């Protein structure tokens, strides 16, 4: 029996519980052990929820329960999430997370703590939602010298740019529509100013180069200045506009990392990624180009990762 605790019962946290419960037989078969959600940590109560009896409010309950060996952190932020993750790893409990802000800021430290205490700190869900990209960079492409990573890493901005291109609409109109549909937050700053994509490309760059890339030092520009006229100009030249996180090796010790809107030829694979979908385009010195594509956000895709 593997007992799991889920930290946070919002969109992603409830998705994690749903994935584990719905795919329980398959997960148990693949892991050769029974997987069970024992605790759900949240400040709120959830009367009437199918799993309300698992909801607790004190993290110490999880820390003091030796039967809990895996923790799924879906809280977000770098305050309590950092403290809880650090405490869990120091007790030898493995942690997996969707928290890109935490990984971007404290990832190297938390990975080191995990190594020292013979457990794992896993963050596949922190970049690209359900797209498998962390493991490919870490394991599948071990023999590759990664020369560049270019990615559409934020579904909100890709949805907005796709609608602006197809309908000739202005930024503010499409943003409001995205908010009405739930694709954009009421405060969309992290998305539209590029901060979300910045944290993600910093994580990918750190894996790519084997050294920490500080997201706060990555030059970042969002999409708020893009206009319908920009798309008219791009279309006339057979180009489109995408917000990309870009990381390029200049030499063994130097990399160029940035987030900004770029013009792409319409026959480029990334130019064909529309709506809320994400994609990561990886260039290796032996493999050449490969692309990883899928839903970059959402309850179940992120929970699946």
In which residue ranges do the predicted regions lie?
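N-terminal glycine-/serine-/threonine-rich beta1-alpha1-beta2 phosphate-ribose binding loop
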Residues: 1-91
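Short glycine-rich anion-binding loops that position phosphate/pyrophosphate groups of nucleotides
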Residues: 76-78, 154, 264-265
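A short hydrophobic/small-residue beta-strand
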Residues: 94-96
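Conserved anion/nucleotide-ligand pocket segment
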Residues: 139-193, 197-199, 204
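Substrate-binding/catalytic subdomain of NAD(P)-dependent oxidoreductase enzymes
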Residues: 175-272, 277-279
């Amino acid at each position: 029996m593997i007992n799991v605790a889920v930290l946070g019962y919002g969109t992603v946290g409830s998705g994690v519980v749903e994935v584990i419960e719905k795919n329980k037989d398959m997960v148990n078969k693949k892991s050769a052990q029974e997987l069970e959600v024992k605790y759900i940590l949240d400040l709120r109560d959830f009367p009437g929820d199918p799993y309300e009896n698992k909801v607790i409010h004190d993290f110490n309950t999880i820390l003091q329960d030796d039967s809990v060996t895996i923790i799924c952190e879906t809280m977000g932020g770098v305050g309590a999430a950092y403290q809880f993750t650090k405490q869990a790893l120091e007790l030898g409990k493995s942690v997996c997370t969707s928290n890109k802000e935490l990984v971007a800021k404290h990832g190297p430290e938390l990975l080191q703590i995990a190594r020292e205490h013979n457990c794992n700190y896993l963050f596949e869900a922190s970049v690209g939602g359900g797209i498998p990209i962390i493991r490919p960079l870490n394991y599948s492409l071990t023999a590759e010298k990664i020369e560049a990573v270019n990615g559409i890493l934020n579904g909100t901005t890709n949805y907005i740019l796709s609608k602006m291109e197809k309908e000739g609409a202005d930024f503010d109109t499409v943003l409001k529509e995205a908010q009405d549909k739930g694709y954009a937050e009421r405060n969309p700053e992290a998305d539209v100013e590029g901060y979300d994509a910045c944290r993600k490309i910093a994580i990918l760059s750190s894996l790519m180069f084997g050294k920490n890339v500080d997201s706060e030092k990555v030059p970042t520009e969002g999409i708020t200045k893009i206009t319908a006229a920009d798309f008219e100009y791009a279309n006339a030249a057979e180009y489109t506009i995408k917000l990309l996180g870009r990381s390029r090796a200049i030499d063994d010790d130097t990399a160029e990392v940035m987030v900004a809107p770029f013009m792409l030829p319409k026959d480029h694979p990334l130019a064909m990624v529309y709506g809320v979908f994400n994609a990561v385009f990886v260039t290796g010195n032996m493999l050449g180009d490969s692309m990883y594509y899928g839903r970059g956000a959402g309850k179940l895709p992120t929970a699946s990762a």
